[in-house]
Amino acid sequence: ALRAAHAPGVVLDADALTAFEDAPETLFEMLHAGCILTPHAGEFARLFPDIAETLNAPATKGPACSRVDATRAAAERAGCVVLLKGPDTVIAAPDGSCSIHAAHYDRAAPWLATAGSGDVLAGLVTGMMARGLGPAQAAEAAAWLHVEAARRFGPGLIAEDLPETMPQVLRALGV
């Protein structure tokens, strides 16, 4: 029960999001501030079709809609943190606060674009929440660790390599 009086933090990814593609408002009614949605671009478009349309539209009148704008609008509508996955992962809370975690330039990790890596990210977010971080902070920490593990492993990465590399990342941080 997502809306229970003392509902725990809940991370929704993949099929948990796709299950509501025909009725996203039903999902939004059940969410609370302790929830996190972790869609990739396709899942985002199914949950927030109007926002995705604006995001993908050319800027013919006025300024373009950025991934930051779109993620903020989605978080406000859903009433919870939204982590929009991509090479520039955007994390937004319903209050409008936002962070971006890039996996390009000096933190390039293009090999993260592999099947299952988003599932690992959702697991990392869940683990961070279990350790007591709030939803936005858990999403931010998990996104950073996700990229660091991928960078440490390097090319040829498959999703299963990410959790196996995490102890090295944490040791390097002194954790």
Where are the regions that the model predicts?
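Phosphate-handling active-site elements
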Residues: 129-142, 150-156
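Short pre-catalytic strand/loop immediately N-terminal to key active-site residues, enriched for Gly-Thr
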Residues: 103-116
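Glycine-rich phosphate/dinucleotide-binding loop and adjoining beta-alpha-beta core of small-molecule
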Residues: 1-104
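Charged C-terminal helix
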Residues: 147-175
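Feature representing long, continuous alpha-helical segments
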Residues: 69, 122-123, 136, 164
